[in-house]
């Protein structure tokens, strides 16, 4: 009984003491985080980044758990100026995060260390995932108009962008024969 009273008295002190150490990366103490990245693209989002994550630097940094650096920017989309974040891993862009209505709406993953939960990652060949583009793929738009975007099988939120060599007319999709040698260059999650 005495140890129970002591524990009840010590518990609030321990809990308040931990709250003052918010800068400590506690997830690093978990053994399953010791060996490699646990960040994956899933139906819910990318790692802890989901559709409910506010499009704010601190919220994104908290969800990334200190594993990356953030860089913010502005761009125009459909005639509006919008904010976006680039997630940096060293000197390379690992992810681009876009949003609307105050929360994350799209995450473009460019880092081969962040796979989809199905195992697909940057560099996976088209032929490993699809036998033909028809019914699965379409030309990518915007800055990526030389690429092809394909919906991930069984997914409502994930698609893969493939790129490779092709010298055909602009605006047309490459043939299935050409696409079989293309590789995933971007994994896209949309809300």
Swiss-Prot record:
Alphabetically ordered keywords of this record: Signal
Signal peptide boundaries: 1-22
InterPro entries: DUF1131 (IPR010938), YfeY-like_sf (IPR038714)
Keyword Iron in annotation: no
Protein name, as recorded: Uncharacterized protein YfeY
Source species of the chain: Escherichia coli (strain K12)
């Amino acid at each position: 009984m005495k140890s129970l009273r002591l524990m009840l008295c010590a518990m609030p002190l321990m809990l308040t003491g931990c709250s003052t150490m918010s800068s400590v990366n506690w997830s690093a103490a978990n053994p399953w985080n010791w060996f490699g990245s646990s960040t994956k693209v899933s139906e819910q989002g990318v790692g802890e980044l989901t559709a409910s994550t506010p499009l704010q630097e601190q919220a994104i940094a908290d969800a990334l758990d200190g594993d990356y650096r953030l860089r913010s920017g502005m761009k125009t989309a459909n005639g509006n100026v919008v904010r976006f974040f680039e997630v940096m891993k060293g000197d390379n862009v690992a992810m681009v995060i876009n949003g609307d209505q105050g929360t994350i709406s799209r995450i473009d993953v460019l880092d081969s260390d962040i796979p989809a939960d199905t195992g697909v990652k940057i560099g996976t060949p088209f032929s490993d995932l699809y036998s033909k583009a028809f019914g699965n793929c379409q030309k990518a738009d915007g800055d990526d108009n030389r690429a092809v975007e394909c919906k991930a099988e069984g997914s409502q939120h994930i698609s893969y962008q493939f790129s490779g060599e092709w010298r055909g007319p602009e605006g047309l999709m490459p043939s299935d024969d050409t696409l079989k040698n293309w590789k995933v260059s971007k994994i896209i999650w949309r809300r």
